[in-house]
Amino acid sequence: MKITAARVIITCPGRNFVTLKIETDQGVYGIGDATLNGRELSVVAYLQEHVAPCLIGMDPRRIEDIWQYVYRGAYWRRGPVTMRAIAAVDMALWDIKAKMAGMPLYQLLGGRSRDGIMVYGHANGSDIAETVEAVGHYIDMGYKAIRAQTGVPGIKDAYGVGRGKLYYEPADASLPSVTGWDTRKALNYVPKLFEELRKTYGFDHHLLHDGHHRYTPQEAANLGKMLEPYQLFWLEDCTPAENQEAFRLVRQHTVTPLAVGEIFNTIWDAKDLIQNQLIDYIRATVVGAGGLTHLRRIADLASLYQVRTGCHGATDLSPVTMGCALHFDTWVPNFGIQEYMRHTEETDAVFPHDYWFEKGELFVGETPGHGVDIDEELAAKYPYKPAYLPVARLEDGTMWNW
């Protein structure tokens, strides 16, 4: 069995997605996601110029060997562009292997560890009252876990506050938009949101919050401490993870569970945080961390230290990544939760899939492979559109972490 083609497909049914389709001499094909939000064409170039030509003639069943080839063979390893290209190849190969075996991907990974996948949705509003109402909307839809983000008085375009009730897409056309940030204002306001949420809905639902790398270690510890009475499922990305020792300070001052890792690319990014038990959830993704082959290694390491998975699942990941993540979630023993932001109807049409939502959980189907395909004819009707993620500045104009 040989790979005969590896084609890159770019489409924008509401936002940009990069898809790799690997074809074989036996007529079986697989698809993988290579989307890097706001930097999509960098991965396209890497795939087309440096990866796809090398795959022709290889045996697609040799998943591990091909993973090592595209990782070690490049010499310039790691990084978001390289690892997303590797992830796309890896997803497509697992898709092919599961199709050849005639079984859904989770069976090939080791079978079910659970029936349904608990997911969390994104509720947001321009102020506390609007966010409380939005959380109620998600509860009415059956969600058991909801991330809550609110606009903060005096902060321009606070993170996580979208233009609609169900869809949040921060990437803008043209050049990056400028948002604001003021830690003092956020620390004074965010705890009030969760106080009101618990007062309104009680403690029967899981609540989550994303700091999005905005806080210093001391500020993050302060926020975690203030949120303790409201029993959050987790506080995500409370401080930039490049400074991993910072999580030791946060850990020493709060028992609010900590989650990090959506921007991690390899096990080396997560190793110290996991082994030192400085986090509770690892949020590395199938597309960001080099595919299922490498994400399994991260999860296996995490399981030794009682760290659970909580894969990133925003709309910057295509349904291909979501499908792979759900098969991974169905298998992985140390599963925690799965982020789930609904895609647009146009995106769902371009990427037909067999997973579905019911009563706060996602379920995978029994289709051989990862259960997600791409309608190339429809995809061609949505050409690429340049879009950048925003940037953030403090009130005095200083650049900050978006």
From Swiss-Prot:
Keyword DNA-binding appears in the UniProt entry: no
Cofactor: Mg(2+)
Annotated EC: 4.2.1.8
Pathway recorded for this protein: Carbohydrate metabolism; pentose and glucuronate interconversion
Site-annotated residues for Important for activity and substrate specificity: 314
Assigned keywords, A-Z: Carbohydrate metabolism, Lyase, Magnesium, Metal-binding, Plasmid
Catalysed transformations (reactions): D-mannonate = 2-dehydro-3-deoxy-D-gluconate + H2O
Outcome following mutation: residue 283 to A: Abolishes catalytic activity
Family membership noted in the UniProt record: Belongs to the mandelate racemase/muconate lactonizing enzyme family. GalD subfamily.
Protein name in UniProt: D-mannonate dehydratase
